[in-house]
Amino acid sequence: MDTFQVIILALIQGLTEFLPISSSAHLILPAQLLGWEDQGLSFDVAVNTGSLLAVVMYFRRELLSMFTAWTSSIVTGKQTQESKLSWWIILATIPAVIVGFSAKGFIETHFRSIEVIAATTIIFGLLLWWADKMQREGFNEFQVGWKKALVIGIAQAMALIPGTSRSGATITAALMLGLSREAAARFSFLMSVPVSLGAAILVTKDLLDSGQVIDYQALGLGIVVSFIAAYICIHYFLKIISKMGMTPFVVYRLALGAVLCGFIFL
């Protein structure tokens, strides 16, 4: 990958990782329009690491408070709202871990196509619109509970299907369960930490096992670009949804799905 390709794809990944619009749907477009080949494991390591660092940096105070409360709850047995939230995040991660280890190969083989990505982009865009329209109660993330956390975790596991969008699926589920828009987004972002950490570790292992020559310059550039893009994305996404809701992202998903359908049928 040349420098231009690294920058463009890292920008796309960083900007779309935390928006409910599907990063896989966007990464397929450069391949279709410019004939770019698969990005390779080095790029996957870079963008996973950059996105993880961005969400950890943005929510550093919340994560530190949660981690401190969680470790204290293990030692003392006493639960606070921060420790409960930590346990719910852990619970919500389990479905994605199970599906990821048991069905990743099957999903990559049978669902990683432009037809599937186009369909899921549109279908889950409509579900996001419906969930946002129906959202009424406005719970915060400290009121989730283990049942809601598990349902949101199942939605995250479904997002392993390309085009679904991890943040889109989890935010949709959270809205359906009565969380406010901001709380749904924050819970989704916090959920991304263990998932992104696990993905970064697994992809790094795959890279080391593959024996590929590592392009450290491209790796470093990808981390920096995806970190900056993801950090900015998180900040402005939270501001946008508090004022405009999910409608802009629904419209965008439907338009993107239409473009992908154009590649299929034209």
Swiss-Prot record:
E.C. numbers: 3.6.1.27
Biological processes, Gene Ontology terms: cell wall organization; peptidoglycan biosynthetic process; regulation of cell shape; response to antibiotic
Database matches in InterPro entries: UppP
GO molecular function: undecaprenyl-diphosphatase activity
Coiled coil: none
Catalytically driven reaction(s): di-trans,octa-cis-undecaprenyl diphosphate + H2O = di-trans,octa-cis-undecaprenyl phosphate + phosphate + H(+)
Membrane topology, record value: Multi-pass membrane protein
Keywords: Antibiotic resistance, Cell inner membrane, Cell membrane, Cell shape, Cell wall biogenesis/degradation, Hydrolase, Membrane, Peptidoglycan synthesis, Transmembrane, Transmembrane helix
Function of the molecule: Catalyzes the dephosphorylation of undecaprenyl diphosphate (UPP). Confers resistance to bacitracin.
Full protein name: Undecaprenyl-diphosphatase
